[in-house]
A protein has these predicted regions:
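Intrinsic disorder/low-complexity segments
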Residues: 1, 396-426
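Flavin (primarily FAD) cofactor-binding/catalytic cores of flavoenzymes
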Residues: 2-37, 80-181, 185-398, 426
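Generic low-complexity, intrinsically disordered sequence content enriched
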Residues: 21, 27, 53-54, 63, ...
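Flavin (FAD/FMN) cofactor-binding and adjacent substrate-gating region
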Residues: 42-75, 234-255
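Enriched - but not universal
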Residues: 43, 57, 97, 211, ...
């Protein structure tokens, strides 16, 4: 008979690890599947810097003991601001050592419904029963490939999530498609790696975030000495003043009347933008704005021919698609068809209720798939606290339960340490 666990978490990124921390602190039995921070480590470009502020980059734990500051102290090394990708990955892996030292690195190949819960099949053939399943596997399957690039081989056109080391493009001509942080930072990294780069942006202009750009007003407003800073900028600081507070409080954001208005507010909060500290690194990179790729064709030897909406042609060695992600949970390969048939969805997103529970009792979704129901905060690390607290509360107190009795564990949870106790070293 297959082993039974109260809660299975699929995914060991920020959302999965934060949820494990909160559930274990609540005494709920949990089993976490996945490799800690795998997407961040393998599918984000080397050399990347986090755009989010320091206070918006902590992975949430119940006692606020496992912050970036705590990681700095435990590792005896300072973490630069902005936070480099490799340091954030190391922080997340350290966080995982504290809250999920028993992390199960096996991949989940399939999740099927059962009468009192779910059956999970691992890639190595093991069968595990779980009362609840938390899907926290991130956005990797949702990489958006624009229609002109359909059928183009990955050697000629790839998504930013498919290329972690830009040094392979040294000496080659690369067109970066997009106008947000991913596109602009990728262009800077490519240029610094020795590539000949052009950025092609559909929008008429690039929206620059002034963080780090040298703006004295911006620095003064964000200074900890500014007495009105808490009134202007919540810790997450997503979107312009005013809207940023709605985004920071999903319970308020979801009260915005009509889905259409909420959608406009969300798009305004997370519109494509680049950090101000990127501008000096792009001085020698040509940026063509107000132009879209309308056709792409392999040819000219091993090169790619791009037809642009302004009537011009580019022939490049590679097109790097910084074109974002389009959530569609049907693209999670492990969800069985019978689960998907019972899943109420809105444009690819699961419709979620209290505790981030879907229309399939006991099946929860975290991260970007929760953004339709709880707002754009769920797309960022800053949302881990709200999500993990809400899910842990619902599971502990049986809000919209699955019918499977969630049992409290008999042993103490992994050390969720207080500041005066010794942390596991990185």
């Amino acid at each position: 008979m297959a082993a039974t666990i109260p809660v299975a978490i699929i995914g060991a990124g920020p959302y999965g690890l934060a949820t494990a921390a909160h559930l274990r602190a609540a005494g709920v039995g949990v089993h976490v599947f996945g490799e800690a921070m795998a997407f961040w480590e393998r599918q984000m470009p080397a050399g990347m810097l986090l755009r989010s502020y320091w206070d918006a980059s902590h992975i949430a734990d119940p006692n606020h003991d496992l912050t970036l500051d705590a990681y700095e102290a435990a590792s005896h090394t300072a973490v630069p601001r902005p936070v480099p990708l490799e340091r954030f990955v190391a922080y997340g892996q350290w966080f995982g050592q504290q809250v999920a030292p028993d992390l199960d690195q096996r991949q989940i190949a399939r999740v099927e419904p059962e009468t009192d819960g779910f059956r999970l099949m691992t890639a190595d053939g093991a069968s595990i029963r779980a009362g609840r399943v938390v899907v926290a596997t991130g956005i990797a399957p949702f990489a958006c490939r624009p229609p002109p690039f359909a059928g183009i081989a990955p050697a000629l056109a790839s998504h930013t999530a498919e290329c972690g080391d830009f040094r392979v493009f040294a000496g080659r001509h690369v067109a970066v498609i997009g106008g947000g942080q991913s596109a602009l930072e990728s262009a800077a990294l490519l240029h610094e790696a020795g590539a000949d780069v052009e950025v092609i942006v559909r929008a008429a202009e690039i929206h620059w975030l002034r963080y780090g750009s040298g703006s004295q007003l911006h620095a003064a407003l964000h200074s900890d000495r500014n007495p009105v800073k808490p009134l202007l900028f919540p810790a997450s600081d997503i979107g312009p003043p005013g809207l940023n507070y709605l985004v920071d409080k999903p319970a308020l954001f979801t009260k915005i009347p009509t889905r259409a208005i909420r959608g406009r507010a969300a798009r305004r909060a997370i519109r494509p933008a680049g950090s101000g500290w990127l501008r000096p690194r792009l001085r020698d990179v040509p940026i063509t704005m107000g132009t879209a790729v309308i056709a792409a064709k392999a040819g000219c030897g091993d090169r790619l021919r791009l037809a642009l909406s302004d009537g011009t042609i580019r022939t490049v060695d590679h097109a790097l698609l910084a074109t974002g992600y389009a959530v569609d949970v049907a693209r999670y390969p492990f969800l069985a068809p019978e689960l998907l048939r019972g899943l109420d969805r809105i444009a690819g997103y699961p419709r979620l209720h209290a505790g981030f529970e879907s229309s399939v009792p006991g099946l929860h979704f975290l991260g970007a798939p929760a953004a339709e129901s709880f707002g754009p905060l769920m797309r960022f690390v800053a949302g881990t606290g709200y999500a993990a607290r809400g899910l842990a509360h619902a599971v502990k107190f049986g809000v919209r339960g699955s019918g499977f009795e969630v049992r409290r564990t008999g042993s103490a949870p992994p050390e969720l340490v207080s500041p005066n106790r010794e942390l596991r070293t990185p």
